[in-house]
């Protein structure tokens, strides 16, 4: 009972047309054989043509699949000689890493700082860092910096420049997908630089407008440097406003008692420089040939922190004339009148020479005038070459020779 006879078939008791599906729409071409009978199966069997299997292959029929290499994106965004140069750089770098011994001392980046950067990650903060990890991180950072610099240098070379600029780095970042994480940083820096440059330009225009209203011209700056907005006067205007010039501004000379106001000084002593921020300099004409101008009072520029000190402690021991600037040793007899030169034999050796800065005239009167040659080189007095006979014939010498020294023992003799 469990056996099934061989004569049993699924077609037994079923009509002949069971395997045919007729479309209810009446289209005779839409009949499909489902394949219950032998006739339906034989209809779908078609003869296989005789084709060489080596000529037709399913790999050749489909498009070739390119296997991506880890170095395919090295030359991304570059063509021609630039791509070839970058490919050669990477090949040389790989050969160096594979064959040369990598020493820790040859690294250009500090390992301690790299460890701190690695510790900022939340996954590594509470874990130990191996000794090789900072080394590999530093080596990869060096290669990354070198490649980015090389791409920026190729862009600067096209523009015939020898220095890298911010635009070169931005161009190198925009050409490769590997540097997408730097786009936000570069764009932020560019926005900050543009804002600062526009603000400096606005301040310069405002200062120029204010200077035009006040009759002042802005100080010219060098190319590439922002104008700080300090207007400088022209050569025909005073460096201070009228309100400041009305105040008593003192000008110290060699002695603080000889103070002069700023209005008394000639305006030609100030000059405006074309380039550079220099202080107004004092134009002192060299009139060394004119003897009358040697001992005239010249204003001396004193530093602000020394003005109060000089006012409280005046240097009264210095001579206010031209000899205050010339410290040379000369005989005192050269600065004396002619009749005092005859007393040179009675003077001691320590009193013969005295610095001219401290050598004041013993008798009131104007100091002796010197010509240009005598100011530079001390000239001997002609009185030194007079003979004793000539001195005896001098009436001045006879006048002093008859006088006795009050401290001498012979001065107490009765007349």
UniProtKB/Swiss-Prot annotation:
Pfam families: Histone. The keyword Transcription regulation applies. This is Transcriptional activator hap5. Keywords: Activator, DNA-binding, Nucleus, Transcription, Transcription regulation. Residues 369-415 have a biased composition (Polar residues). The keyword Ubl conjugation does not apply. It comes from Schizosaccharomyces pombe (strain 972 / ATCC 24843) (Fission yeast). It is found in: Nucleus. Belongs to the NFYC/HAP5 subunit family. Residues 354-415 are annotated as: Disordered.
């Amino acid at each position: 009972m469990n056996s099934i006879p061989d004569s049993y078939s699924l077609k037994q008791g079923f009509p002949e047309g069971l395997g045919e599906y007729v479309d209810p729409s009446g289209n005779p071409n839409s009949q499909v054989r489902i394949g219950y009978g032998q006739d339906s199966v034989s209809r779908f069997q078609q003869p296989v043509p005789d084709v060489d299997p080596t000529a037709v292959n399913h790999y050749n029929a489909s498009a070739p699949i390119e296997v991506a290499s880890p170095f395919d994106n090295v030359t991304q965004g570059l063509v021609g000689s630039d791509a070839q140069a970058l490919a050669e750089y990477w090949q040389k770098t790989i050969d160096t890493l594979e064959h040369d011994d990598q020493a820790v001392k040859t690294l250009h980046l500090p390992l301690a700082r790299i460890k701190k950067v690695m510790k900022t990650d939340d996954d590594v903060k509470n874990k130990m860092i191996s000794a090789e990890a900072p080394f590999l991180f530093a080596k990869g950072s060096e290669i990354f910096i070198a490649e980015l610099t090389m791409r920026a240098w190729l862009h600067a070379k096209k523009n015939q420049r020898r220095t890298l600029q911010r635009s070169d780095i931005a161009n190198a970042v925009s050409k490769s997908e590997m540097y997408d994480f730097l786009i936000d940083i570069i764009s932020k820096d560019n926005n900050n630089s543009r804002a600062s440059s526009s603000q400096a330009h606005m301040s310069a225009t405002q200062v120029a407008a204010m200077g035009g209203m006040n009759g002042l011209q802005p100080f010219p700056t060098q190319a590439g440097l922002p104008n700080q907005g300090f207007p400088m006067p022209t050569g025909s205007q005073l460096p201070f406003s009228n309100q400041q010039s009305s105040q008593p501004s003192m000008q110290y000379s060699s002695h603080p008692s000889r103070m002069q106001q700023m209005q008394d000084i000639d305006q030609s002593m100030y000059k405006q420089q074309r380039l550079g921020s220099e202080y107004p300099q004092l134009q002192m004409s060299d009139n060394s040939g004119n003897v009358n101008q040697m001992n005239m009072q010249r204003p001396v520029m004193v530093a602000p922190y020394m003005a109060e000190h000089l006012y409280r402690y005046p240097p009264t021991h210095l001579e206010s004339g031209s000899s205050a600037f010339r410290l040379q040793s000369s005989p005192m007899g050269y600065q004396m009148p002619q009749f005092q030169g005859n007393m040179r034999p009675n003077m001691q050796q320590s009193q013969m020479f005295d610095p001219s800065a401290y050598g004041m005239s013993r008798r009131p009167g104007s100091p002796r005038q010197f010509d240009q040659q005598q100011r530079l080189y001390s000239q001997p007095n002609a009185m030194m070459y007079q003979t004793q006979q000539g001195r005896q014939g001098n009436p001045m010498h006879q006048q002093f020779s008859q006088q006795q020294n009050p401290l001498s023992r012979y001065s107490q003799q009765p007349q």
